[in-house]
Amino acid sequence: MKTINENAPQVSSWQTYRRLLAFAKPYRLLLVAALIAALIEAAGTTGFLALMKPITDETFIYKNAEVSRWLPVQIILLFVIRGAAGYITDMAMGKSARSIARDLRVKVMSKYLRLPGSRFDSEPVPSMLIRLGSDSDQVAQAAVDAVKVMIQQSLQVIGALALMLWHSWQVTLTILVLAPVLAWVMDKVARRYRRISHSIQESGAHLLQAADQTLSSHQEVKIYGAQQSEMERYSGLADRNLRLAMKVESTRGISTATVQMIGAIGLSALLFVAGAQALAGRLTAGDFVVLMTSMLTIIPGLKQLTNVQNMVQRGLASAERLFSVLDSPDEPDQGQVPLTRAKGLIEFRDVTARYPGQANPALADVSFVAQPGTVTAIVGRSGSGKSSLIKLIPRFYEAESGQILLDGHPVQAYALADLRRQIALVGQQVMLFDGSIAENVAYGEMRQCDAGQLERAIQGANAMEFVAQLPEGLQSHVGTKGGRLSGGQRQRLAIARAMLKDAPILILDEATAALDNESERLVQDALHKLMPDRTTLVIAHRLSTIEHADQVLVMDQGRIVERGTHQELLALGGLYSHLHGMQFRERQA
């Protein structure tokens, strides 16, 4: 069976970031407002630094009472404006970031629902949840939150440097000699963060996957005494995640210490050169205080600009994981043949199918015809290819070779949506969603059905006898995955869903295999009401349930090894007869 190619070409950080910024376009007005507010906030910081000169010179040296009275008012006004601008920046950036995360989640979720079935075999659901959860948040942080920090701190650093140049270009140029060293440090930090970020994202997905497997199988874990081994496995994964996290902390600590050391060298240079300028009479005490406070503003700004690299690189690593999903090809859907309601003639012609990475085919040279309105039973040992066969009809997977036809046309000739409207599926593992009974029966495109149709479907599926006893009737909630209902009740709701759909093709995948005798009787009775006038394919575990099938296909190792009616196959004395005899002896025992 065909799969998708997940080996995406390598792209640079800038290409990834540029593509990421495209998600910010719908919010550009918010971002422009945030940028203007950030400029005002940075100007407020620079203005406060500039006030250091009159505060020092006019208040403490020249004793200017008039200036001293107005300076506190100016400082208060400055910080009111700066605070308002900071609030606008935070709100606009926050709204943009959360909106981008929401858009990414919806886009990736929509993409997952358009991917072929092979994707769900190659990527575990916990990994998908990581992409929809923390990956989307970290991408939003990289796209907006990191930009906010970079803009705010960069503007403040630029403003402080401009102020320093204004008061003493000689001192400022002396400090700027350290800029290449700082740039080298930031580049090294960014590269290391990106390497570690990829590993951390994968490690988090493995942790979630391990927890999901263990907790969802808690009964098996307890009954087989596997708590210790599962905890050791999870602990090992958690330890690896911790080691990677500590590498991030180590990088952050080293980079912070390095930036602070560079800042200390800069301060020392400032003191040395400014002292010489002051002795020469070219620098007042106010100028010196401005230079000093500006430098003390620059150092934390540079520190934050270095630390924000972690946020950016983690976001870029998450973006690459999300883009690998968005860039995956959708299910092939180029069908043009119109299809309103199929007659139900299904034909397999020499169909071979293979799962990715498997040497032996799941199906090999399978050929048969299912006439409209007939029942075709598919039986065989576990792993013989029964489920693989029926998954090809709605094109959950694609065949490697051969043809599958519906009403004389290859199934690829129909649009996927039209093809799947012709099929109702009732499986052994019924999937109910956390909602009401009515919402689960009238599911998907059937949401617009009227109350009469819904009740007739539930009545026909022998489900009304238990639905009527529930406190809220059709509006009763079924719980997560239908956990508030028994297996037989869930199965009857699945049959009601199929009845409501009224599709010309019905697929039953071991629909009664896990039920007790009473539940099986009710479900079989409901199925007998559902099957007439439809092309029905039944995967049967209990051979007694398919004795009246129009044809029985016996599969072994991906091939049809016998075919005929129940009586013909018993008379043949082959594999079917052997399986039937085994089940008969089990029932007698």
Curated annotation (Swiss-Prot):
ATP binds at G380, R381, S382, G383, S384, G385, K386, S387. InterPro entries: AAA+_ATPase, ABC1_TM_dom, ABC1_TM_sf, ABC_transporter-like_ATP-bd, ABC_transporter-like_CS, ABC_transpr_lipidA, P-loop_NTPase, Type_1_exporter. It is a multi-pass membrane protein. It is an enzyme of class 7 (translocase). Residues 32-314 form the ABC transmembrane type-1 domain. SUPFAM superfamilies: ABC transporter transmembrane region (SSF90123), P-loop containing nucleoside triphosphate hydrolases (SSF52540). Its EC number is 7.5.2.6. It is found in: Cell inner membrane. The chain crosses the membrane at residues 29-49, 70-90, 157-177, 261-281, 283-303. Keywords: ATP-binding, Cell inner membrane, Cell membrane, Lipid transport, Membrane, Nucleotide-binding, Translocase, Transmembrane, Transmembrane helix, Transport. GO terms for biological process: transmembrane transport. GO terms for cellular component: plasma membrane. GO terms for molecular function: ABC-type transporter activity; ATP binding; ATP hydrolysis activity; ATPase-coupled lipid transmembrane transporter activity. The keyword GTP-binding does not apply. In MsbA the ATP-binding domain (NBD) and the transmembrane domain (TMD) are fused. NCBIfam families: MsbA_lipidA (TIGR02203). Homodimer. Belongs to the ABC transporter superfamily. Lipid exporter (TC 3.A.1.106) family. This is ATP-dependent lipid A-core flippase. It comes from Xanthomonas campestris pv. campestris (strain ATCC 33913 / DSM 3586 / NCPPB 528 / LMG 568 / P 25). The lineage of its organism: Bacteria, Pseudomonadati, Pseudomonadota, Gammaproteobacteria, Lysobacterales. The gene is msbA.
